[in-house]
């Protein structure tokens, strides 16, 4: 009976110590949540293991997530998968269908996301860009001959038009001098000419008469203008002037004819003529409807390119996101109480088995101790 009592007591005490020790060891993983101080001295094993190592745990989890879970290679492989491509195409199709039925104007859509007066801003941006490009272009070619500003093909075509221009000038001149207005103008010119000649002019005018002189000069002028040699002379003159003009540098031409204001004025007129305002006044649906089918056919190709570009920029994007720092901050801010609750709810059965195992080992150790006590 004595021996049985010793065994029972030693086993019970050992089992109790083992079970309680393991139970407290499990609890001390999380508790106490904060360090406890007595007389300014921190009590050992406070705070619990996880609260004490929270910073290190957060850092290690951040490194684990970025180094082993959300890796660039894994994300790239996911982006390149057929499932993601299919989802991207489906999203594009839904977006295209919604936009094609939209009755909002482009301007209204942009204003709804905070962009006010988009048409005016777009026109100003285009004008500013055109000014910058045009100014840079003119400065770069300021000391170059004009022929370098135009393609050789354009120069040849312009030269081919010279006979036509010459013929047009002469035909207009003939029409003018044959008209009453031209005849009257010619009469005034003859009067002015004779007045400048003084007495000689008065004598000629007295003998011939002004109207008689005009009637004689007008046919001769018309005859001269219709003469083939006159056409050839004018054509040669225009070709010579064109060849000289091509050799002018832009700076020389600008100094002579003040070209820059003309060029920029032409630019302003062209921009006003082709203002972007009508585009912004159109509905999104009408803007898309004309090429909706083309977009739908190209959606798979567009999705592939978009995902490929996303994959190329993934490294930089992940660095800018600083996922490791985000995970660390989230772990730092996660309540220890909630973490304890989660771990215990998941591993409650296992923790109980650890407690029971501690009791079993403690009981075995107690039995061994009882044997030694009896033998001694």
Swiss-Prot record:
User: Which InterPro entries does the record associate with it?
Assistant: DUF445, UCP032178
Has keyword Cell membrane? yes
Q: Which residues cross the membrane?
A: 1-21, 356-376
From which domain of life does this come? Answer: Bacteria
Q: Cite the entry's keywords alphabetically.
A: Cell membrane, Membrane, Transmembrane, Transmembrane helix
Instruction: Note whether ATP-binding occurs among the keywords.
Output: no
Question: Membrane topology for this entry?
Answer: Multi-pass membrane protein
One GO cellular component term noted in the UniProt record for this chain? plasma membrane
Q: Where in the cell is it found?
A: Cell membrane
A Pfam entry, by short name: DUF445
Family under the similarity heading = Belongs to the UPF0754 family.
Matching entries from PANTHER family are given as: UPF0754 MEMBRANE PROTEIN YHEB
Name it. Answer: UPF0754 membrane protein BLi01057/BL02871
């Amino acid at each position: 009976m004595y021996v049985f009592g010793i065994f029972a007591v030693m086993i019970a005490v050992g089992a109790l110590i083992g079970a309680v020790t393991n139970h407290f060891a499990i609890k001390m993983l999380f508790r106490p949540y904060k360090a406890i101080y007595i007389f300014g001295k921190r009590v050992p094993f406070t705070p619990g293991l996880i609260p004490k190592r929270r910073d290190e745990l957060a850092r290690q989890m951040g490194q684990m997530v970025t180094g082993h879970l959300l890796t660039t290679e894994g994300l790239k492989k996911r982006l390149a998968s057929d499932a993601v491509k299919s989802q991207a195409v489906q999203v594009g199709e839904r977006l295209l269908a919604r936009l094609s039925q939209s009755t909002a104007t482009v301007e209204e859509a942009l204003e709804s996301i905070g962009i006010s007066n988009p048409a005016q801003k777009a026109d100003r941006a285009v004008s500013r860009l055109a000014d910058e490009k045009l100014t840079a272009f003119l400065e770069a070619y300021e000391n170059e001959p004009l022929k370098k500003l135009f393609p050789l093909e354009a120069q040849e075509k312009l030269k081919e038009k010279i006979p036509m221009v010459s013929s047009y000038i002469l035909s207009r001149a003939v029409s003018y001098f044959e008209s009453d207005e031209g005849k009257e103008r010619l009469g005034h010119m003859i009067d002015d000419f004779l007045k400048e000649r003084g007495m000689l002019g008065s004598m000629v005018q007295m003998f011939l008469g002004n109207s008689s002189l005009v009637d004689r000069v007008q046919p001769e002028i018309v005859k001269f203008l219709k003469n083939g040699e006159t056409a050839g002379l004018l054509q040669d003159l225009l070709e010579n002037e064109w060849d000289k003009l091509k050799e002018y540098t832009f700076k020389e031409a600008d100094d002579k004819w003040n070209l820059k204001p003309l060029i920029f004025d032409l630019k302003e007129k062209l921009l006003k003529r082709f203002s972007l305002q009508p585009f912004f006044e159109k509905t999104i649906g009408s803007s898309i409807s004309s090429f909706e089918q083309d977009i739908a056919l190209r959606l798979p190709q567009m999705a592939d390119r978009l995902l490929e570009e996303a994959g190329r920029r993934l490294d930089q994007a992940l660095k800018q996101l600083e996922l490791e720092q985000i995970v660390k901050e989230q772990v730092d801010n996660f309540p220890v109480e909630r973490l304890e609750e989660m771990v215990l709810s998941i591993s409650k059965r296992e923790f109980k088995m650890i407690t029971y195992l501690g009791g079993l080992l403690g009981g075995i150790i107690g039995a061994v101790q009882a044997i030694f006590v009896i033998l001694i």
